[in-house]
Amino acid sequence: MQKYISEARLLLALAIPVILAQIAQTAMGFVDTVMAGGYSATDMAAVAIGTSIWLPAILFGHGLLLALTPVIAQLNGSGRRERIAHQVRQGFWLAGFVSVLIMLVLWNAGYIIRSMENIDPALADKAVGYLRALLWGAPGYLFFQVARNQCEGLAKTKPGMVMGFIGLLVNIPVNYIFIYGHFGMPELGGVGCGVATAAVYWVMFLAMVSYIKRARSMRDIRNEKGTAKPDPAVMKRLIQLGLPIALALFFEVTLFAVVALLVSPLGIVDVAGHQIALNFSSLMFVLPMSLAAAVTIRVGYRLGQGSTLDAQTAARTGLMVGVCMATLTAIFTVSLREQIALLYNDNPEVVTLAAHLMLLAAVYQISDSIQVIGSGILRGYKDTRSIFYITFTAYWVLGLPSGYILALTDLVVEPMGPAGFWIGFIIGLTSAAIMMMLRMRFLQRLPSVIILQRASR
């Protein structure tokens, strides 16, 4: 028992700054939604639709770069710090290439939005404008993630926390300026949220680079000599590790994003209620997601040290702490769901729908916690392909079809509207949690030699 208590302390020491950083990041979305909602319900719905396309695209790049964290943690644990700088430099090259692709996709996303059935033309125009403003922040966001992954792989999670709050503090006044048109700036409404967020991502990246250049603990990494040219072999390995993570994130996020697109023809009330419930549940999700990042660091570091038993301890401790956190957040969500909805919008119909959907969100929080921490554990073991297969099966084969049938057809019951999709979320996330745990048990029962050989790749 003592080893689990000690490991829990180490995990929380890593996870708490990550939690705070993620809260700051998610709070930026909260601020965008609230401030756009204060301008008009149409602008809030436009931000919701635009975000439903932005998130799958940018999180694909984010997932690709997550391969850096276990790679750096394993190199750090095995005492091979001299190899870290080269990995980071290749991460920046990879981020640059991916950001160009993402920007092209987002620029042309208007075709998707305007092809939605029965979508209001004014709503579509605002959503397209929001995306075309936001896409200029894609390189800044991905470059920031490379720098952050470097710090977190070295078990330094506080810098990401500090930069997250800097971003949040900058986002609020810049939102105000561009949404309402102050200090000589144009009044852009929801599009102003995109302008503000793009600017904030570049501020966060530049602030993180400034920290890394001054950090004494990273002097040996920073001082590596040589020209930062693309290294195809290293980039190929990062892609091999990161692509399954990216696709897994893509499949998970598109479960939510596609639902937002399917809900949009149902009307502004349904879109707004769904967005409020989804935005708040995302705020609660930062707890297990941040703990998963800490577990990845600890598992990768322990495997770098050659200790498979300590890696198991880190994994099990992370799961126990995550379930406890999820239970508390579920109770909080159920108890205060109506008051939470009122923070976003005072339309009675929107508040009623959002409060109802939050009940369903509370149901899946425990299984969601298990599946995301399970994914973090598998990343630590560098077993990323299994994450891809599990998420595809859980979200696209089980979750989304189930939600569609319940929400929009009468094959099982009368069409349930947004609530049917949320039941689909429960089915998908619970299935993912079960499969993640089965895969983890399989890996941990392999001979130590094989586990360490896989981790050192």
From Swiss-Prot:
GO biological process: sodium ion transport; xenobiotic transmembrane transport
Pfam families, A to Z: MatE
UniProt GO cellular component terms: plasma membrane
Record-linked InterPro entries: MATE_fam, MATE_MdtK, MdtK-like, Multidrug-R_MdtK
Membrane-crossing segments per the record: 11-31, 53-73, 93-113, 127-147, 160-180, 189-209, 243-263, 276-296, 314-334, 350-370, 387-407, 418-438
Keywords: Antiport, Cell inner membrane, Cell membrane, Ion transport, Membrane, Sodium, Sodium transport, Transmembrane, Transmembrane helix, Transport
Membrane topology: Multi-pass membrane protein
Disulfide bond residue pairs: none
Keyword Aminoacyl-tRNA synthetase annotated: no
GO molecular function, one term: xenobiotic transmembrane transporter activity
Top-level taxon in the UniProt lineage: Bacteria
Subcellular location(s) per record: Cell inner membrane
HAMAP family in the record: MdtK
Family: Belongs to the multi antimicrobial extrusion (MATE) (TC 2.A.66.1) family. MdtK subfamily.
Annotated function: Multidrug efflux pump that functions probably as a Na(+)/drug antiporter.
Protein name: Multidrug resistance protein MdtK
Originating organism: Escherichia coli O139:H28 (strain E24377A / ETEC)
